Amino acid sequence: MFARPNTLLVFYRVSCPTCKLTLPYLHRVQMPVLGISQDDAEATEKFRQQFEVKIESVLDLAAEGYPASNEFGVHHVPTMFVLDEKGEIAERIEGFDKDALERLGACFAESERVPEFRPG
């Protein structure tokens, strides 16, 4: 469904605190990023504007049974998938995983300075 080569897929909900901290920075990753919102179009657009989310987003709706989330086995948000050149999953990052996010951070432009995440 969303198997785009060399892409970061990010499943999220607008009510997720970790998503609110993470998504505004993902446009800086040096690869295409596709957000997959589990909320309706209005809530998703409001979230994108409020938190200055600059990545493309598509909807994965409850009314349709969350087809993309089910296809990728997503049970928590945020869940991110790094897809390789064949469009296959190279890495899965679920929730807040500091080590995985640091590896993902290596994809940021050298000139970007992302603030350290300190939950709680």
Task: Give each language-model segment a name.
Residues 56-63:
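Short acidic-hydrophobic, aromatic-tinged amphipathic segments that line or gate anion-handling sites
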Residues 11-16, 38:
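Aromatic-flanked redox-active Cys/Sec active sites in thiol-based oxidoreductases
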Residues 31, 55-56:
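Short, conserved active-site loop motifs that form the nucleotide-linked donor/cofactor pocket
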Residues 1-7, 21, 28-34, 42-45, ...:
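Non-globular targeting/processing and membrane-anchoring segments
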Residues 38, 60, 95:
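Active-site donor-binding loop signature of nucleotide-sugar glycosyltransferases
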Residues 65-68:
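A short, acidic/glycine-rich surface segment
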